[in-house]
Design a protein with these regions (language model features):
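Selective transmembrane helix interface/packing segments
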Residues: 2-268
Length: 268
């Protein structure tokens, strides 16, 4: 489909006799920019690639030649790194977890930038609103904390700690073990991905609703009054989405830090 909403592409207005074409799942499907055989390179792929390049380019510019007194990009970069370290990593992992700082910094800024595309003209799509990209992020996190647990605790000890949370009566184990294993191995990554996807998906739908309503209601008659109200709501929702985009990157990275912390050592 076209990147332009149907209501805009069709020139449909409330007094032109056509019904309101509400946003749908079709607004999350994109025609390939180009194809190589059966592989199609789509807009979300491009935005994800650009997000990665932006993160790499920014931190390269900030820290390739660090100065004793930080200025410009280095100053902003240090603020970002310190934010992740002091607000996300240290509260859960302590100083012993500083080795995971590059991973958490990269994860936080990569997700944040992918979310920010929603409010950038022309792009106007949050990449995690396409659930496949949320699952890719979850897969990276899952592989990381499972690997950390196996390496740091040993496979058998790690599995035991996943299945049995501390001291519990023996008679409850047949019920507790499958529930804990499912929760830690399956439910945990599932909820992590769905939370990010659902928030970005819902936010994008809201923006589409008010954006298409603005166009649909626009005319020389009374519809213009309602169109103006809808247009104002586009800016209100955009401001709200800016906060949500940051919070979702923060929550996703914070939960990742807690999972890694749980893999480093058993809970007591």
């Amino acid at each position: 489909m076209s990147d332009v909403p149907v209501v805009v592409a069709s020139g449909c207005h409330i007094f032109s006799g056509c019904g309101y074409p509400a946003p749908s799942l079709n607004d999350f499907n994109f025609a390939p920019i180009f194809t190589i055989g059966s592989f199609g390179f789509t807009k979300p792929m491009l935005l994800a690639l650009l997000s990665m390049l932006v993160v790499i380019a920014f931190f390269w510019a900030a820290f390739a030649r660090p100065k004793l007194v930080p200025r410009g990009a280095q100053n902003i970069g240090e603020m970002g790194v310190l934010f992740v370290r002091d607000q996300i990593l240290r509260p859960f992992l302590g100083k012993k977890g500083d080795g995971y700082l590059p991973f958490l910094v990269s994860l936080f800024f990569f997700i944040w930038i992918m979310n920010l595309w929603e409010v950038i003209p022309v792009a106007q799509f949050p990449v995690p609103a396409h659930i496949a990209y949320a699952w890719i992020l979850v897969a990276m996190v899952w592989i990381t904390y499972m690997t950390v647990g196996v390496v740091k605790q040993g496979p058998l000890t790690f599995l035991k700690n996943l299945a049995i949370p501390g001291e519990v009566p023996w008679w409850i184990l047949p019920l507790l073990v499958p529930v804990e294993l499912a929760s830690n191995i399956l439910v945990r990554p599932f909820t992590l991905g769905v939370r990010l996807f659902a928030n970005m998906f819902a936010g994008h739908i809201l923006l589409l609703v008010f954006y298409t309503a603005t166009w649909y209601l626009a005319s020389l008659s009374i519809g213009a009054v309602f169109a103006a109200g809808s247009f104002v709501m586009v800016f209100v929702i955009t401001g709200f989405e800016l906060l949500i985009q940051f919070l979702q990157a923060y929550i996703f990275t914070t939960l990742t830090a807690t999972y890694i912390a749980g893999s480093l050592e058993a809970a007591h």
